[in-house]
């Protein structure tokens, strides 16, 4: 179960994310693997879990509960951010995803954002995905609904992110304490090879260019460093 946290403000949208995956599944850190898009690449299926385009639009995809991994007859969910990032705004990206057939994919959550708006998108295996604008404030999403405090991870960590400035969010992502259901940074060696494999910090301010930082490993081990701009060139 991946985690993504957003702070949505009049000054912009600020994002922190941990990617949880089987440690044996190969991936590459963010780069310009696609024209005008900077993001990590899943080597197995060729898509991405989180990426940023040259227009300052971010798209991320998360598995919903009990849907880890591929399934026969289903397309890779990693192509969904790439579809969204053909667009020039979060509004247009949300509209593009809601025109798709959700039945082509295993169940998914998506987060779409730019400096002016953020959306939660759910795809539940039938019909078309549904997009919901996220209000100002702090929002945490994992494998279910936004800010669902019935989920132990959200119940524990949402108040911590809400109380901390964005400059401290990288340290919060690194927290591996607590029982498994509440852990934000999961040690793969202690969980049958499944755990937190990398992390992202992304600022989308209205008044300046995006700032994209990436930790190429669990965030208590790997340092955050700047990665490619998605701008042309």
Protein language model features and the residues they cover:
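N-terminal nucleophile
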Residues: 1-233
């Amino acid at each position: 179960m991946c985690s993504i946290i957003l702070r949505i403000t009049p000054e912009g949208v600020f994002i922190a994310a941990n990617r949880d995956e089987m440690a044996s599944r190969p991936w590459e850190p963010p780069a310009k693997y696609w024209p005008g898009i900077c993001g990590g690449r899943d080597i197995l299926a060729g898509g991405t879990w989180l990426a940023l385009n040259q227009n300052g639009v971010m798209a991320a995809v998360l598995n919903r509960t009990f849907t880890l991994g591929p399934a026969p007859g289903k397309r890779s969910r990693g192509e969904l951010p790439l579809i969204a990032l053909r667009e020039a705004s979060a509004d247009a990206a949300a509209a593009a995803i809601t025109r798709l057939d959700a039945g082509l994919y295993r169940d998914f959550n998506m987060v779409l954002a730019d400096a002016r708006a953020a959306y939660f998108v759910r795809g539940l295996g039938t019909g078309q995905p549904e997009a919901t604008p996220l209000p100002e404030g702090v929002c945490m999403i994992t494998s279910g609904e936004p800010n669902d405090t019935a989920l132990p991870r959200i119940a524990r960590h949402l108040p911590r992110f809400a109380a901390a400035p964005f400059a401290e969010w990288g340290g919060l992502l690194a927290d591996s304490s607590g029982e498994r259901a509440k852990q934000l940074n999961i040690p793969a060696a202690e969980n049958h090879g499944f755990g937190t494999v990398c992390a992202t910090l992304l600022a989308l301010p209205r008044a300046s260019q995006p700032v994209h930082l990436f930790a190429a490993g669990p965030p208590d081990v790997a340092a955050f460093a700047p990665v490619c701009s998605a701008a042309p060139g």
